[in-house]
Regions:
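Glycine/proline-rich active-site loop of Rossmann-fold NAD(P)-dependent oxidoreductases
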Residues: 138, 150-153, 163-173, 183, ...
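NAD(P)-cofactor binding segment of oxidoreductase domains
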Residues: 64-105
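Conserved Rossmann-fold NAD(P)-dependent oxidoreductase catalytic core, especially the SDR/UDP-sugar
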Residues: 91-132
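Catalytic helix-loop patch of NAD(P)-dependent Rossmann-fold dehydrogenases
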Residues: 117-157
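Conserved C-terminal active-site "lid" loop/helix of NAD(P)H-dependent oxidoreductases
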Residues: 230, 250-273
Length: 298
């Protein structure tokens, strides 16, 4: 297949490398100047473009068979999200409308679920987020689903949980820096997925995803905050994080949610088997790599 990866960053670059390894022709689109050696080593043909600009895709071929939009925002404001995700998606749909790919996969986020009661959510659950950035992501999903209905655009949506892996993992990094805290009784649920499994889920969606469908990309074991930090403390022989201050939630830029995201549909319909089915297996691998590289803080 001739593939286009829109957003060759933390997920997109290794995704492109894996697709190239599988024998596909891979193009990688990035807003900023690319590091030629990095792309060449991954087997990716670079293309510099800005999907937020009216003519930003000029010169890009129309004949891709698989397209993945896994672009990431460079800033956290709702307006920046709107520019990158919503406006960018609109231009991609317009660009490929005359000659659609066989499959178009968009990586959205489980933040579109605004539940705060610890309930289990699936793809048909209510999406009513309080965070402005999550509202933009939901609006982007709806734009894409409209194109599916009205134009038969072959799009599949993956709602991706908090990604961790090499150099990434917000709660893990906070723990290592002694900046983590436990909220209340620690019962708030954390939903995670290793980067390798994000890549695996995207490829499964390209192969088996049905246009117009949404799939939650999250590991098998959403975990309470207390359980997660107790495990880390035991593995790394460190103290537990302190209790969060009373005004902790008020100081967060993003809304605080508490939900248990189900991956049942993704596993059943896409047939994907997780490399790291829970946080223990994933973080055991990450901790080992840090130890071997001498990068694990004392």
């Amino acid at each position: 297949m001739k593939c286009l990866i829109v957003g060759c960053g933390y997920v997109g670059l290794p995704l492109g490398a894996e697709l190239a390894r599988l024998g596909h022709e891979v193009w990688g689109l990035r807003r900023s100047a690319v590091v030629e050696d990095e792309f060449k080593a991954a087997g990716i043909r670079p293309f510099v473009a800005d999907i937020t600009k009216p003519d930003g895709l000029a010169g890009l071929p129309h004949d891709f068979e698989w397209v993945v939009n896994c672009i990431a925002s460079s800033g956290g404001s709702a307006e920046n999200y709107r520019r990158i995700y919503l406006h960018g998606m609109s231009r991609l749909i317009e660009w490929f409308s005359a000659s659609p790919p066989k499959k178009f996969v968009y990586t959205s986020s489980t933040s579109v679920y605004g539940q705060t009661d610890g309930s289990t959510v699936k793809e048909t659950s209510l999406t009513a987020p309080s965070a402005e950035t999550a509202k933009v992501l939901l609006e982007t999903e709806r734009l894409l689903l409209t194109a599916v209905r009205e134009q038969k655009f072959p799009a599949v949506i993956l709602r991706v949980a908090a990604i961790y892996g090499p150099g990434r993992g917000v709660w893990f990094k906070q723990f290592l820096k002694n900046e983590a805290c436990i909220e209340g009784d620690g019962s708030r649920i954390l939903n995670m997925i290793h980067r390798d499994d994000v890549i695996g889920c995207i490829i499964a969606a390209l192969r088996n995803g049905r246009p117009g469908e949404i799939y939650n990309a999250v590991d098998d074991e959403p975990v309470s905050q207390a359980t997660f930090f107790h495990w880390l403390a035991g593995e790394l022989r460190r103290d537990l994080p302190p209790a969060a201050p009373e005004n902790w939630a008020e100081n967060r830029k993003r809304g605080v949610t508490n939900k248990r995201v189900s991956n049942r549909k993704l596993k059943m319909e896409l047939g994907y088997q997780f490399k790291y089915p829970d946080f223990r297996s994933g973080y055991t691998a990450e901790i080992l790599q840090l130890e071997q590289a001498g990068k694990l803080p004392e």
